[in-house]
Amino acid sequence: ASDVYKRQKKYRTRFLISSGNKLFTLAVSDVAYFYSENKLTFVVTKNNREYVLDFALDKLCEQLNPDVFFRTNRQTLVSVDAIQRIEPYFLGKAVVHVLPPFKDKIIVSKDKIAAFKVWLNY
């Protein structure tokens, strides 16, 4: 049984956040989504707090449980718990509405929409 345990991937459970002159931990379970803008990565919590993270979205994808987080596009990585609804968009794409609301449209590309629907229905 210990061999099986060792082979199971361990996913990140928290982040150390620097805010002003304070440090605190943020549980991954409190995260609604991550987004990238101007070469910075931001984390938005379920209670609508926003912090800068020192991780690229690609790195986060490797460290977070793929059953919980989905890379919707180059700019966003969303938690299944934050998704409020999905609407069809042009050319086979979809728009994802999250809580707390994101300032832009979160668009899932035509290439990812099938995988996204499978992921949501898991």
What is each stretch, according to the model?
Residues S2, K6-Y122:
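Basic, polyanion-interacting recognition surfaces, primarily
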